[in-house]
Amino acid sequence: MAEFFATNLWPLLVVIGQSVLLLVILLIAIAYILLADRKIWAAVQIRRGPNVVGPWGLLQSFADLLKFVLKEPTIPDGANKGLFLLAPLVTCVLALAAWAVIPVNAGWVIADINVGVLYILAVSSLSVYGIIMAGWSSNSKYPFLAALRSAAQMVSYEVSIGFVVICVLLCVGSLNLTAIVEAQDGKWGMLGWYWLPLFPMFVVFYVSALAETNRPPFDLVEAESELVAGFMVEYSSTPYLLFMLGEYVAIVTMCAMGTILFLGGWLPPVPYAPFTWVPGIVWFSLKLLFMFFLFAMAKAIVPRYRYDQLMRLGWKVFLPLSLAMVVIVASVLQFADLAPK
């Protein structure tokens, strides 16, 4: 054991330091992305949004954090206390864990593994367990019904996202996220990114990501006019905050996935100066914010689907379309001799 630590202590400390730094940056970014979400929603409704705490309301998210932390958490009588408190922690930790493999610039990744996309899909799939645990452990029928809704919804749209990944995999020949970005690098710039040749799959990914993260118009899990707060109805204080944090981290993760799979990751839109002078992390951040803007606009302007419409869209529209696109992409790559060697 002593020999192991003597050999691996420094690399271990480096990874821990990188993880803590990423965690701090991500949590601060989430605070302002939440504020941006509220501001965009307010602008669509011709309101000002949060504008009291700090200049232009920039400290509103931190005030909300303080409010949640200072509140007393309540646990319902008859609830399974252990699972009730574990559920939000599971949801939040799994959402944060996905960022271990996401490259935000060339070489800027904690774990550059060859199955990065598969890892993200696996971690995002596991988050449904936190929701099921929350609904079941609350010992109330309404959170349990909402948790079942969520499980069915997330499983339905994970299938479509899986076929989207297969299409990109066919074009790249690798599940490594860095390799996917590098495969989109070329003299055509943004016209060579996969959003153009795989545009139907880009649309499928965008809509499926909305459903996967329980965002409007697919927020049937926590529809305010129907279920109040869905599976979170019995939660308050810090556990509720962890659920909210996990939800927004999952949204940003899906935005990052869309950026890497279809928008060229950290690559500049035009591969010539002065665009190449801008650091890759800036391009990645701008593309991620563009994807989040699409998420926020869907929340602001699209009415909520009925549950039967949600399931019909997933199984009767997206699944056949995704399967057809996989066959078409594979056929074109094979007969045009464009398949990666």
Curated annotation (Swiss-Prot):
GO molecular function list: NADH dehydrogenase activity; oxidoreductase activity, acting on NAD(P)H, quinone or similar compound as acceptor; quinone binding
UniProt entry tagged with the keyword NADP: no
Bilayer-crossing regions: 13-33, 82-102, 115-135, 161-181, 190-210, 248-268, 277-297, 313-333
Location in the cell: Cell inner membrane
EC code: 7.1.1.-
Gene that this polypeptide is encoded by: nuoH1
Cysteines paired by S-S bonds: none
Protein name: NADH-quinone oxidoreductase subunit H 1
Keyword annotations from UniProtKB, A to Z: Cell inner membrane, Cell membrane, Membrane, NAD, Quinone, Translocase, Transmembrane, Transmembrane helix, Ubiquinone
Catalytic activity: a quinone + NADH + 5 H(+)(in) = a quinol + NAD(+) + 4 H(+)(out)
Functional note: NDH-1 shuttles electrons from NADH, via FMN and iron-sulfur (Fe-S) centers, to quinones in the respiratory chain. The immediate electron acceptor for the enzyme in this species is believed to be ubiquinone. Couples the redox reaction to proton translocation (for every two electrons transferred, four hydrogen ions are translocated across the cytoplasmic membrane), and thus conserves the redox energy in a proton gradient. This subunit may bind ubiquinone.
PANTHER family named in the record: NADH DEHYDROGENASE SUBUNIT 1 (PTHR11432), NADH-UBIQUINONE OXIDOREDUCTASE CHAIN 1 (PTHR11432:SF3)
RNA-binding listed as a keyword: no
Record Pfam families: NADHdh
Gene Ontology biological-process annotations: aerobic respiration
InterPro entries (UniProt xref): NADH_UbQ_OxRdtase_su1/FPO, NADH_UbQ_OxRdtase_su1_CS
Membrane topology: Multi-pass membrane protein
Subunit structure: NDH-1 is composed of 14 different subunits. Subunits NuoA, H, J, K, L, M, N constitute the membrane sector of the complex.
Stated family: Belongs to the complex I subunit 1 family.
One GO cellular component term noted in the UniProt record for this chain: plasma membrane
Predominant localisation class: membrane
